[in-house]
């Protein structure tokens, strides 16, 4: 790109927040994504693409598979980031995999358009390997470990509730602990969403834009 891309906040025709990086192809993709996903997802994709093109410093049509491997290596060895889980430097495998997904989605969009010089995605699907029986399979570029969710013990929940000083804070934590609400869902609750007679909560803005009652 010859210069560090700058992420600019824009607005769509419908007044919704959008993003632009100053490259026509990237901006076209971000506008496409803006109409198909939630604001948090759009923000993550925009930042992922900004990070990628800042590090690679190439125009989208010039990127090759070697650049993808170089980007993965850079993210794994980023000394400006220290993981809390193990104290090692570099981003987590989950974060790197998400960024690769954003990059892959961008190039899949360019290929699907058919009116750009990009005929195929430079993002490898994975590394080919052979298992027993001669069956080939694909090993992902970044392995994301499967981990069990971390939950609070009853004693920890009791200690947490005991440390809260207001009824509002206790109600928010109870909604998450007993109702399984996500943080963003609790923050999005309005007084009218609390149905006291039915002892239920109406979630208007759940994950993926889905609504539900708990």
Predicted regions and their residues:
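N-terminal DNA-binding module of tyrosine recombinases/phage integrases
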Residues: 1-36, 148
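Short, low-complexity cationic-aromatic patches
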Residues: 18-22, 92, 96-100, 179
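N-terminal alpha-helical segment
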Residues: 25-26, 68, 77, 153, ...
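N-terminal core-binding DNA-recognition domain of tyrosine recombinases/integrases
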Residues: 27-43, 49-142
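DNA breakage-rejoining catalytic core of tyrosine-based enzymes
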Residues: 130-159, 208-214
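Basic, Lys/Arg- and aromatic-enriched nucleic-acid-binding interface segment
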Residues: 150, 154-183, 187, 207-211
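Conserved tyrosine-mediated DNA breakage-rejoining catalytic core shared by Y-recombinases
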Residues: 184, 188-214
């Amino acid at each position: 790109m010859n210069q560090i891309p700058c992420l600019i906040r824009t607005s769509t025709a419908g007044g919704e927040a959008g993003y632009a990086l100053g490259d026509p192809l990237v901006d076209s993709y971000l506008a496409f994504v803006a109409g198909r996903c939630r604001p948090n997802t759009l923000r993550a994709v925009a930042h992922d693409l900004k990070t990628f093109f800042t590090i690679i410093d190439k125009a989208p049509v010039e990127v090759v598979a070697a650049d993808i491997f170089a980007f993965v290596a850079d993210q794994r060895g980023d000394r400006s980031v220290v993981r809390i889980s193990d104290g090692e430097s570099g981003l987590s495998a989950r974060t790197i995999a998400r960024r690769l997904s954003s990059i892959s989605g961008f190039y899949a969009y360019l290929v699907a358009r058919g009116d750009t010089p990009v005929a195929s995605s430079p993002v490898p699907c994975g590394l080919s390997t052979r298992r027993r029986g001669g069956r080939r399979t694909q090993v992902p570029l970044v392995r994301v470990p499967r981990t069990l969710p971390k939950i609070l013990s009853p004693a920890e929940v009791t200690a947490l509730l005991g440390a809260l000083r207001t009824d509002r804070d206790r109600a928010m934590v109870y909604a998450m602990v007993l109702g399984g609400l996500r943080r963003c869902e609790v923050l999005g609750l309005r007084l009218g969403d609390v149905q006291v007679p039915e002892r239920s909560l109406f979630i208007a803005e759940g994950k993926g834009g889905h609504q539900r009652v708990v």
